[in-house]
Amino acid sequence: MLGFGILLTGCGRKKSSFSIGADVSFVPQSEARGVIYQDENGVPKDIFRIMADHHFDNIRLRIFVNPEAEKGYSPKQGFCDLQHTVDLAKRIKAAGMKFTLDFHYSDTWADPDKQYKPSAWEGKTGEALESALYAYTKSVLTTLREEGIAPQMVQIGNEINHGLVWPEGYIDDNAKEANWITMLGIYKAGQRAVREVLPKTQLMIHLALGGENTLCHQYLDYMIKNGAEFDVIGLSYYEQWHETYNDLKTNLYDLSAYYNKPVCVCEYGANKDNIKIINDIVRSVPNGLGYGTMAWEPAQTLFTSVDGSMQGRMPQPGQEGQVFKLNASSEIFGIYDAIYAQYIDPKFISDVEPPFVRTVENSDQIIGADISWVPSQEDKGTKFSDKGVQKDVLEILKDNHFNYIRLRLFVDPTSENGYSKEGYCGLEQTLAMAKRVKAAGMKFLLDFHYSDTWADPGKQFIPASWERFNGSGLEGQVYRYTHETIKKFIAEGARPDMVQIGNEINHGMLWPQGKIGESYMPFGVMLRCASAGVRAADPSILIMVHIACGGQNEESVAFFDKIISRDVKFDVIGESYYPKWHGTLDDLKNNLTDLANRYGKPLIVVEYQDYRKEVNDIVKNLPNGLGWGTFIWEATSPRWGDLFDGSGKTNDNMAIYSTLNY
């Protein structure tokens, strides 16, 4: 260990070309509220020297135009203004580190949910707005240059995948050429100021699209087309919003190769489980184009409270006058020390598997049934039988050629306006039923409703326990709930073979935020979060997107064109087909045939009631073997699936399935 210490300390310390960075713009606020940063031995030191001692070499600072404005970030103390930035940048430079400046072009936070125009620029549009942004950018950079603390890298905006300086610079999925030109005109005003004042400083474009390759290409291609420049591609990556690690890896590898630019994960939420994973992924980018990473506000992870009073968090307002001593965490800093020790060897190859491509396969034609009502029926005394012999309902279905069972899941059916005070279709009831499905040797499709009760084209009520969430908070909750639920099923031995991320969602989900209006953008983010939640738990589980448009081709195409353009990752197209809403059998056949030819994805009629043989035959005969099968809805209900009578006995309709010799 002595030799290791000598290698990494002292004047002769080797340097890695890979940058280990962080955004710690909260530091002045923490220190103003009494925080004292200490090294592992409890010796007070400047936080930047502590970080530099552990191989951090690049610190990013955000800057707001006027945080003291009425609706600004820090009306009383002006944190993240120019003066605070100057003072902090001097400390960064004194610690021997590089400095990245992150222009938010707002008086407060700017991110994909919001890009508020600074109060000083209200009323400005067009060239006047561009001139204001140019003058502000030039003034800030000139000040930093004259103070001897010019940044090595500059971001023209923060997480600007939906544009910057709204409303003029706003872009969404319906953005026209003129919208892009306006937004990029604003961007180029900042670009011009950077190039004039600091011609050697790198420009980093910052998009909150860690795993969204399609959207990254769309954005960067528009930039190039309109003369907007970038030297480094910077991406935010937070697991709950930006897809899986494999998606991140795939995106970084592709973007670096396609644009021949370095790539940087310039925001991630560092924790002991993901630091090495994310850094190794970026370090593994071919041709040395993995620039590095920047952990976002990691002080609460890097430091621990000596007395437990803070547990590493920033003190809250009202705690002024107190002293909080935070010691450097040997565990977390040790992770960074270890990866640095590996990265200084230019021949070191990160232990990262190449990006993998999902394979979509199905061995048998699906003859499926939704039997989510069964636990309620059984609790009320229903005994199921076939040809006079009483059997478990799953055995009866299997005897009649059924091989796949669909079960719906509500978030909390016992809530005030929920589906069932007894908890039917809740997690525990659904899990118990799923175990029975697996024990019967059948496959299992899990149908997330993302509601406490029925979700369909006419209603998509947000769960009661989620009403406190909005914006990115609700999107993150979709990911967490999906991910945790799938992990629970897997841990209990009831792994779903396929998952629906929403039920009949052609009008959106989780209303009002996820309701489809003129824009699919909020809904698209939710759907991406749901998909990522499944794939992060088990990348081999098939993902279905389910709409209720069995015979409506125009609506089906419009929907799937949009979600594909919004980078939603899914494997199977699911359609409901009820003749009174979805047209004739010819309408169904024509729609499914077109979808198969157009998208090349497997299709399943995941809900139907009538025309049992005809629907199955239509799906079976779709082009290129893409008709995977069907699920009859509520097979045990005399009113719906009607394969059993009210007493639980099979009826003549069941015999149809024995004739489906697929």
Residue ranges and their predicted role:
Residues 25-27, 64-66, 104-108, 156-161, ...:
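Active-site beta-loop-alpha junctions enriched in small/polar residues
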Residues 32-33, 254-260, 272-361, 587-590, ...:
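Aromatic-rich peripheral "rim/lid" segments of glycoside hydrolase catalytic domains that contact
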Residues 52, 93, 195, 257, ...:
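Anion (oxyanion) recognition and catalysis
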